[in-house]
Regions:
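The feature marks the mature, well-folded catalytic cores of soluble enzymes
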Residues: 1-343
Length: 343
């Protein structure tokens, strides 16, 4: 049956997409779920955590006279203008005020903080399945509430769509070695092959239990492949991108078991771990001929731009400094509702 919610390939022609809004409430450093991440942060990053504690992006004026929300939304608008050139339908979630989050989830969730910019992680569309994911950090759990209204609207005007949810984890404390965890930044839809990135050991993001859950849910129709990535890599989409069939951007040194066999005989643009810090793999295909790539003050990502252009791909560059400083970029900020390869 025809559906207006459908994704078949990472590089299918993009027709409908959700872009997050740059509203974030930064958590209190005393929250246990935040303290466990301190060991991964530099001194400068820790100072930023403490200076932003309890504030929203509308209350942070580190680059006066504009606040962080305004700076990030300006970058979003540049991205949106590109989508408009291709007649892509855009959805934006409503802002979730602290009072609503407190009412729905409790004071502890507000204390832990929450994010609304990076729409990629709370859910994924595989075929005509909308799958709400169970994220590993409490900071990412409340935001799914803002997408449900969009889902309801789309389903009311679609046919054959399945909307399901992974098992939800009610507590702020979780066992990352037992509870199934998945985040959209670790999932790539490539026809009947689904790649799921997991980090070895005590996963900070998606884990093996999450991979097994997705494999069992999708069944024999899909081949779900686990991709082991090195500790320190936030998500699979920080080291992998598929601009079109036969062409992949990846960081081979971040792949524990080497390049997945799915990409045998493909043209590979291999990036270093240092390049991956500039989020040059976190771009977004509009279709197989057009690609959006971010850059910032430190990482211009010019080499990747030239590599893609030399292969006939038109690259749109978007300045994304204020997103990149929070380890997010173009793919993180967008979640396709409709993508389909045109034959």
């Amino acid at each position: 049956m025809k559906s207006d919610i459908y994704v078949d390939f990472e590089y299918g022609k993009l027709k409908e997409v959700i872009i997050g809004i740059p509203y974030e409430v930064y958590g209190d450093p005393s929250a246990p779920c935040l303290r466990e991440n301190f060991k991964y942060l530099s001194k400068a990053e820790l100072e930023k955590v403490f200076s932003r504690a309890g504030k929203s992006t509308k209350e942070i004026f580190e680059k006066k006279p504009r606040n962080k929300y305004e700076l990030m939304e300006e970058e979003n608008e540049k991205l949106i203008n590109i989508f408009k050139k291709f007649d892509i339908k855009i959805y934006r979630p409503k802002l979730l005020p602290k009072e609503l989050i407190k009412e729905k989830y409790g004071e502890d969730v507000v204390k832990s903080g929450y994010i609304q910019q990076y729409s990629r992680d709370p859910f994924v569309v595989v075929g005509n399945n909308i799958i709400e994911l169970s994220t590993s950090t409490p900071v990412r759990r409340a935001e799914i509430f803002s997408y449900k209204e969009i889902f309801r609207h789309c389903i009311a005007h679609s046919q054959g769509v399945k909307w399901i949810s992974m098992p939800k984890i009610p507590s702020l404390e979780i066992d990352k070695n037992k509870d199934p965890l998945l985040e959209g930044g670790d999932i790539f839809v490539l026809g009947d092959t689904i790649l799921v990135g997991t980090v070895q050991g005590n996963a900070k993001r998606s884990n093996e239990q999450g991979y097994i859950w997705l494999k069992n849910y999708l069944g024999n129709k899909y081949k779900v492949i686990q991709v082991h990535i090195k500790e320190g890599v936030l998500h699979l989409d920080c080291i992998l991108s598929v601009p079109r069939k036969g062409l992949v951007i990846l960081c081979s040194e971040a792949l524990i078991n080497g390049i997945p066999s799915y990409f045998n005989d493909w043209d590979i643009i291999d990036i270093s771990l240092e390049e991956s810090k500039g989020l040059c793999a976190n771009g977004l295909p509009i279709d197989e001929e057009n690609y959006i790539l971010s850059y910032n003050d430190k990482y211009k990502n010019e080499r990747i731009k030239l590599e893609l252009e030399s292969r006939g791909i038109n690259v749109f560059m978007v300045y994304f400094e204020n997103h990149n400083e929070d380890c997010g970029s173009i793919r993180c900020s967008c979640n396709p509702l409709f993508r389909k390869v045109e034959i």
